[in-house]
Amino acid sequence: MSNPSNDLTREELAAWLRLEMAPGVGNRTARQLLLAFGLPQNVFDASAHTLEQVVTPRQRSGLQSIPPQLPELLETTWRWLQSAPLRHRVLTLGDPAYPPSLLEMEDPPLLLYVRGPEWAWTQPA
């Protein structure tokens, strides 16, 4: 099921949240994984051997486990998105609307939770 204000499906949102929550995997490592595999779901579909070409065994283990808090966080985030479809949005690193200045950081956040009309956060301050 897709969210009208966001191009993310619920399944895609779950994968992004899971990557963000993976134990031992910070923003820098997550970005390396995204460069290597493309989308978060591809990271989770990768074999242990393939993952260990990019991350440590400890990080691989964290990526292969599903955080117990994920279902609740997914439900809360999805409800938030649905509550104001034209005013709430989750921007991922791969979203064309992700602020370019943040992409220049060494470890930009994987997800940005945006509230308000799009013009308010896309215009320079």
Each PLM stretch: what is its role?
Residues M1-A125:
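Short, positively charged patches
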